[in-house]
């Protein structure tokens, strides 16, 4: 663990040095105000990021955490795209330098040069040092400015998209065992709301209003509701009491609940009128609905128990499983689940995060089939860390179950 920490720290510091070199040192004069300002910014901003990644900062009132979290997490997103853009710019940099050098040589050539009899041609000198230096500074400013503009534009777009709220997706999923009487049953799936100092009560209210507007038969809240303690976020989650569905609202824990006393949060959710499925199931018209605790709960003796949630049931009935992480799909297949509903991945949240999540999750987003079991993974409604989504817009999915007997 110490080795991993040191490796991450070295990469973090090294990449910030690279950004400082390309954006500050290579584009400003030594001792100038822009260089001093840029240097200070590239010390303060990563410091705020390190503070932001810690939940419930000791000694800082919860309402003030957002003052740290907003710039800290936004810088983390900007930093990601600045690095990517600068790395891409390394390929452009030598091309620009050569093009400018050729242009300067052509400008320096005399229009007419009458030959001198008996005079030896003057040796060709390299470009004067001042001219070469000027070209390098110009190219550094073009590449650095472009990288900064791309990063800021990308993060600005991704932040605005998240704050507008999740999109509504609609998907029809056929289940062979579903009776005709349950054909068209609609489940509103929402995951990864991540209420926090950044996304508070207003965001929760918007999510609730969006869900209710779909008029679902059932609501499934598939984990990672909060990023904070009950004391700090009880007001933020209050709008969930307004969720309305004909067959009720159900909840399973995500890994983030276990960072903040999952047992207490389950109690809060129950008081709000949702039905926690803690390794349990309930019979609904036409199918069984089961839920398991998140695998993170294993460290506290509260891990998933598939035998308890899915054992001793009628295998002729269709079954839907709520499980926060897609990685439990093998257990779902083993227990004959027809449809598993999950979240956790955020669809990658920040491109190219989808590629990284694909290394550790069977499905990053959308619907897949594993044997006789279908797995749907929501991209989630909120965001963890940077309040930004790029290439993975947030969603609330309305799944309409279709009977194979219809």
PLM segments and residue spans:
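Non-catalytic terminal accessory segments
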Residues: 1-163
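Soluble catalytic domains of enzymes that build or remodel membrane lipids, polysaccharides, and related
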Residues: 167-406
């Amino acid at each position: 663990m110490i080795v991993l920490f040191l490796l991450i720290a070295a990469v973090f510091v090294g990449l910030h040095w690279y950004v400082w070199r390309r954006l500050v040192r290579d584009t400003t004069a030594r001792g100038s105000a822009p260089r001093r300002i840029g240097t200070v910014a590239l010390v303060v901003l990563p410091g705020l990021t390190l503070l932001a990644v810690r939940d419930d900062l000791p000694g800082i009132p919860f309402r003030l955490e957002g003052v740290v979290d907003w710039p800290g997490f936004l810088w983390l997103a900007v930093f990601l795209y600045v690095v990517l853009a600068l790395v891409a710019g390394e390929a452009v940099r030598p091309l620009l330098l050569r093009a400018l050098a050729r242009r300067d040589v052509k400008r320096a050539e005399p229009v007419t040069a009458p030959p001198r009899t008996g005079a030896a041609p003057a040796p060709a000198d390299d470009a004067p040092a001042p001219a070469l230096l000027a070209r390098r500074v110009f190219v550094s400013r073009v590449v650095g400015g472009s990288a900064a503009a791309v990063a800021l534009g990308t993060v600005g777009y991704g932040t605005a998209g998240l704050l507008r709220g999740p999109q509504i997706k609609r998907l029809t999923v056929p289940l062979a065992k579903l009776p005709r009487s349950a054909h068209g049953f609609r489940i509103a799936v929402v995951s990864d709301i991540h209420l926090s100092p950044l996304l508070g009560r207003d965001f929760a209210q918007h999510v609730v209003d969006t869900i209710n507007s779909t008029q679902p038969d059932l609501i499934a809240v598939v984990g990672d509701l909060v990023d904070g303690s009950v004391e700090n976020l009880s007001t933020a989650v209050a709008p969930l009491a307004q969720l309305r569905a004909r067959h009720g609202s159900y909840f399973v824990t995500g890994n983030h609940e276990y960072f903040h006393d999952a047992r207490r949060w389950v109690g809060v959710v129950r008081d709000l009128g949702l039905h926690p499925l803690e390794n349990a199931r309930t019979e609904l018209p036409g199918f069984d609905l089961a839920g398991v605790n998140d695998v993170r709960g294993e460290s506290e003796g509260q891990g998933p128990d598939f035998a308890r949630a899915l054992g001793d049931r009628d295998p002729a009935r269709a079954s839907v499983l709520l499980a926060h992480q897609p990685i439990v799909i093998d257990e779902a297949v083993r227990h004959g689940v027809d449809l598993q509903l999950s979240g956790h991945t955020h669809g990658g949240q920040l491109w190219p995060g989808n590629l990284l999540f694909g290394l550790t999750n069977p499905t990053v987003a959308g619907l897949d089939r594993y044997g006789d079991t279908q797995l749907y993974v929501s991209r989630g409604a909120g965001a963890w860390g940077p309040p930004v989504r790029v290439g993975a817009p947030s969603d609330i999915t309305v799944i309409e179950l279709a009977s194979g007997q219809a």
